[in-house]
């Protein structure tokens, strides 16, 4: 259980760090995929 909770906290921390920095490549890819203009 400790290992599972540690992994959850790790992924949550990474996701929060990426969401806090809009200039990361990960967020650019997500925004591009989810943007309406990308579907055109």
From Swiss-Prot:
The keyword Cell inner membrane does not apply. It comes from the Eukaryota. Keywords: Behavior, Secreted, Signal. It is found in: Secreted. Residues 1-17 form the signal peptide. Disulfide bonds: none annotated. One of its GO terms (cellular component) is extracellular space. Lumen fluid of male accessory glands, becomes seminal fluid. The keyword Secreted applies. One of its GO terms (biological process) is regulation of female receptivity. Transferred from male to female during mating and may affect egglaying and behavior after mating. This is Accessory gland-specific peptide 57Db. The lineage of its organism: Eukaryota, Metazoa, Ecdysozoa, Arthropoda, Hexapoda.
